Each structure stands twice: as structure tokens, then as C-alpha cells.
């Protein structure tokens, strides 16, 4: 049986560009397309309270394989292009979700 995973991503966005970056994600349907993927259980962005230039993302996938497939899809490639324009740093962490 595949182990579900939790992925957390923290983007440090160029000064004053956080809202524009998030709006581009929404306007391009990247968040909706990611949520619609088979194997996705959660894909939500958050504004952290400790930084005005960071944007956080929480993802839950049914398996590492499902998340890996996500990174090959066109909307992920759009996100990669947006990151090149808006993002200074990315911290990504992956956690296995234990069976209940």
C-alpha cells in the first residue's frame, strides 16, 4: 500500500510581490488544476503571519508517485515559470503520513 505524504512549501517572494504571485497562481488555474489531479487530497495556499513576503502551500498526496507525476504536468510547468519571475527562495519539506 502506498504511503500518503504531506508536502509543505514556503516561497519567499520578491519584496512586495506576494499578492501578485498568488493572484497569478489563481488566474492561471494552477491551484484548481492541482486539486483536480488524481492522487491529490489537499492543495491550499496560506499567508503566514510571520512574513509579508512569504507564501505557504500545503499539499497532501496519496503517494510520492502521485506527487512526482504532479511535477510533470503543464500547470506545474506554469508554476515553475512564475517562480522564476516572483520567487527568491523555496523551502520544501515532505513528511510521510502514518497509517491510522
Predicted stretch roles:
Residues 17-19, 65, 100:
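Residue-level signal for secondary-structure boundary sites
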Residues 17-41, 75-80:
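Short amphipathic alpha-helical segments
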Residues 5-12, 42-71:
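Short, well-ordered beta-strand segments in beta-rich or mixed alpha/beta enzyme
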Residues 28-29, 33, 63, 90, ...:
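Compositionally biased, intrinsically disordered low-complexity segments
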Amino acid at each position: 500500500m502506498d504511503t500518503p505524504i504531506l508536502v509543505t512549501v514556503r516561497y519567499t517572494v520578491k519584496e512586495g510581490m506576494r499578492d501578485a504571485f498568488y493572484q497569478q497562481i489563481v488566474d492561471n488555474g494552477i491551484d484548481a488544476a492541482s486539486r483536480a489531479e488524481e492522487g491529490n487530497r489537499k492543495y491550499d495556499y496560506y499567508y503566514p503571519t510571520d512574513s509579508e513576503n512569504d507564501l505557504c502551500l500545503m499539499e497532501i498526496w496519496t503517494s510520492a508517485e502521485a506527487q512526482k507525476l504532479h511535477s510533470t504536468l503543464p500547470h506545474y510547468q506554469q508554476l515553475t515559470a512564475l517562480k522564476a519571475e516572483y520567487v527568491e527562495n523555496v523551502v520544501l519539506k515532505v513528511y510521510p503520513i502514518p497509517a491510522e
